């Protein structure tokens, strides 16, 4: 790119400069020259600090590599290892007890436990669907997934199957019995709903009525009191809307005329600029920034074709009901948010992007760019009116930013300093920008309490990320010896300690009722029955939120937060610390290399297939998050985190002679044919197997494995970005 706009010491891509000046700045009351001058100063002051932190990562890794190489034969004592990490500053002293002081945070984060979506910001349709997933039909979620079995003639089919529909209704009634029980009997027995002297009354077959076991769970309704069209209930802070219409197709089959049960579902959503997107240049970044602007202004729209019809999808409005009881101010209406509360995930400290270069042509850190531009855009989510759009995101004046891939408290402190400088540029009060800390790197896990302390007045979220965290676990100890197989990682000692410690330190530092404690993604997008059975373990473990791959999954996962009162779990866990540093330092090394040749081949093939299936869409289609069938054709929601663990495991096995370079190359060639076949129905797919040497995607996958041990902290972004740019240049893709 040769044509750039000069801004002080910076050279800005015209597509970005024009977007900021013509679209993002109007409505913020910020002068363009003042803004760009501030950008120039922040970049000049903080880029060297960013580079120093990355150099510190490399230095620590080099010291750890040397330490392990000196002991790879004789092994080492855990206490010696722990002392070494302390001596080099990798393991830092834990601070004295404290509580976070974050203020001005929305209820969705502080006092509401529920599902969290993560979606790629480059896809406007996905972003709209996620923002609108605050409310979801339980009937649809059940009918369209394997939560309802096909047994007894209940197959989904192409048209409505009343046998399946009856199963859905029965399941929903059982859910209501658990979440909002009647004073006696079952929701399955009712024939109607009405108000009786301001209280909800359910009519029964014999003409009698029964109220709720806890009358306060009734909070609002729509329509006439004698024949409401909707009834609003609440349990554990989450709302349930029962829709009534005896003439609707489903309501007509229900003796109570109930046509649907709608659950408050995706309470919060992360709009992602990081692991789920392929944004490698100025054009990609501006596409994401423009979608983020539309979400904050409330005017994002997308043409959608469904069932042979085309319509425009927009953001949902808030929902207003007649209140069951007048509010403190005498208000007779109850208004609830119609949309998920939005976070934005910036990129980490590692990557740069050519959207802005300095006077010498060096790309500037992408994380600094994201902080400046996503925060500027976030101002629109704090206001309504001319220039800001009709909707707000935060009702408390905060902009929520998830910051990933931070290594230790110094990097968290740097993020907070960056946010403070951005607030100065934007004229925002200090601590407007809140931070979500991803606990997904080993040095952050080991120093989690110190990381939280570094952001004590900004932090609104800590979250475990098993895949990235495992990738860093492997890379940090790359030279210690061969690691166990990928599937065995979830049952290791350090993983259990990691998941428990995150909750315990969150509670210890005052997160309950003030900030989110989150847990990771359910990746098997089509296996919703398994999710409903298993994912309840996360709220039971104290998580106030956990990641889901779709709006449907959000609605199903919401049921878990009705069954589990997470804040009661917090009271039970308070004062405990279940994970120890010694457990966290237990490296997942294979005790002995007792794998049979076919087991090794299976592991290599599984990982190579996973890598190719993800990378080919990343490189050729610019898709950073998608359902990728595994070697057994089970659809998995994959992003860069899954790629990191797979490539790092194979790099580790290569390092220690478990496999050879030729084993990897042969597996990649075999698996390329498998991935080609899995994508055969896609007319735009470019097969890899016929010419692997000519496939940039294939070469990228191979490089990720063969060069995996040399990648900074095992990250995949440097290779992916370079190869995607190569593909775009070769294909004239904009």
Curated annotation (Swiss-Prot):
InterPro entries: Malate_synth_C_sf, Malate_synth_sf, Malate_synthase_TIM, Malate_synthG, MS_C, MS_N, MS_N_TIM-barrel_dom, MSG_insertion. SUPFAM superfamilies: Malate synthase G. Its EC number is 2.3.3.9. Keywords: Cytoplasm, Glyoxylate bypass, Magnesium, Metal-binding, Oxidation, Transferase, Tricarboxylic acid cycle. Pathway: Carbohydrate metabolism; glyoxylate cycle; (S)-malate from isocitrate: step 2/2. GO terms for cellular component: cytosol. Acetyl-CoA binds at residues 118, 125-126, 276, 313, 549. It catalyses: glyoxylate + acetyl-CoA + H2O = (S)-malate + CoA + H(+). GO terms for biological process: glyoxylate catabolic process; glyoxylate cycle; tricarboxylic acid cycle. The active site is at 345 (proton acceptor), 639 (proton donor). It comes from the Bacteria. Glyoxylate binds at residues 345, 440, 465-468. Coiled coil: none annotated. The keyword Ion transport does not apply. GO terms for molecular function: magnesium ion binding; malate synthase activity. Its main location: cytoplasm. It is found in: Cytoplasm. Its cofactor is Mg(2+). Involved in the glycolate utilization. Catalyzes the condensation and subsequent hydrolysis of acetyl-coenzyme A (acetyl-CoA) and glyoxylate to form malate and CoA. Belongs to the malate synthase family. GlcB subfamily. This is Malate synthase G. It comes from Mycolicibacterium vanbaalenii (strain DSM 7251 / JCM 13017 / BCRC 16820 / KCTC 9966 / NRRL B-24157 / PYR-1).
